[in-house]
């Protein structure tokens, strides 16, 4: 995965043909308002998660990111009338580091990486609204806005 595409998926607002320009503008404004009270959160990446089509690092503790998720969900509802879609249910915050569209055995990858990499702390201090089109290996990735968390300790 290209470095600039590394991300922690928070919420999928909807398909690109379902969200209007007016809703996108409203969503950005709502996110700025809601995230004004959210503090940056430090999480640890290290535990490796395996999926048939991806390898990810879990962001722990998930609770540290709950205020951000709540703010984004509230902004999404206010701007679009939709709930948004979590990547997993229950939500497991993670950073995907590799995708695979080939059929291949997972065992060699699991043997090479194991279940845990050295811990790495990262601070999440903003969200980005990104429009993605196409399959995962050929995304058209267009950042629409970056919204910082405004509440600092």
Q: Positions of the model-derived regions?
A:
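Histidine-dependent nucleotide/RNA phosphoesterase domain, centered on the 2H-phosphoesterase fold
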Residues: 1-153
């Amino acid at each position: 995965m290209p470095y600039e595409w590394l991300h922690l998926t928070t919420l999928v607002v909807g398909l690109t043909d379902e969200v209007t320009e007016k809703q996108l503008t409203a969503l950005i404004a709502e996110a700025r308002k809601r995230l004004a009270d959210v503090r940056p959160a430090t999480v640890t990446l290290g535990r490796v998660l395996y999926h048939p089509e991806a390898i990810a690092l879990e962001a722990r503790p998930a609770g540290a990111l709950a205020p951000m998720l709540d703010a984004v969900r509230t902004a999404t509802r206010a701007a679009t009338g939709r709930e948004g879609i979590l990547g997993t249910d229950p939500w497991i915050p993670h950073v995907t580091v590799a995708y695979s569209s080939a059929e291949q055995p997972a065992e060699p990858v699991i043997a090479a990486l194991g279940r845990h990499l050295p811990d790495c702390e990262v601070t999440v201090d903003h969200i980005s609204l990104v429009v993605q089109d196409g399959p995962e290996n050929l995304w058209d990735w267009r950042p629409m806005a970056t919204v910082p968390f405004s509440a600092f300790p």
